[in-house]
Amino acid sequence: MKKIAIIGAGISGLFIANLFRDNQDYQVTIYEKNTSIDLDEGYGIQLSTNSIKLLNKIGFNTLENKDKFHPDKIDFYTVKPEKKICDLNISDFNSFDCKYTTLKRSKLVEFLKDRLEDNIIKYDHDIEKIEKDNNQIIITFNKSIKVICDHLIISDGVFSKGKSIISNNEIKPVYNNSIAIRGNISRKNLNSLNEKNISLFMGSNFHYVIYPTNNDNEASNFIGVLKYKLTANELDNYILKLQ
């Protein structure tokens, strides 16, 4: 039996572990630096039909309809003045069992996590070193914990410590002078927006998108991207917090 170590218990790490769940040829363990997985409500996520096709292989189609939403179109607007430009009918790309989907990120993480045995995820494991000895990989975590595996999958996010270790810090994210703002907006404050669609507003220095994340009458998800230049000190502090 081959041992697979997955670094990071985010969406990608949990999804990969689910793919190997019933394969008796592999023993999969996820190593997560945090002490638990955050299942707070959080923000929304959009999944293309290709994503849904992959997720359905591990039972995503069994998720209750009330916990997800299938938008009909993307409505494009200008920010100033607020005026609709056009729309794109994304439902044209849907099939019976693969539909463009929006939902809360926490709901997707919960679905992926609940399909795995509790002992698959090892918390409070912060990767520090990766070494190779013949055909085996030796991983050193905090508290001098060592793990030996046959295959290593690194999926610990954009500010990946695992990738930095492998590349000797040669791989670093590039800041493009933009920041993301996330939140929720009450549906009663959406004025004339079509609640069945994704609304995308485009401005010179600020784009934002609003969309529902389930079929309940809850607040819609909001995410905006704003042009904003962080100082070198602010950027260093931000990266350190995420590592």
Predicted feature locations:
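Conserved Rossmann-like nucleotide-cofactor binding loop
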Residues: 12, 36, 159
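Short helix-loop capping/hinge motifs at secondary-structure junctions, enriched
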Residues: 187-194, 216
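Glycine-rich FAD pyrophosphate-binding loop
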Residues: 21-41
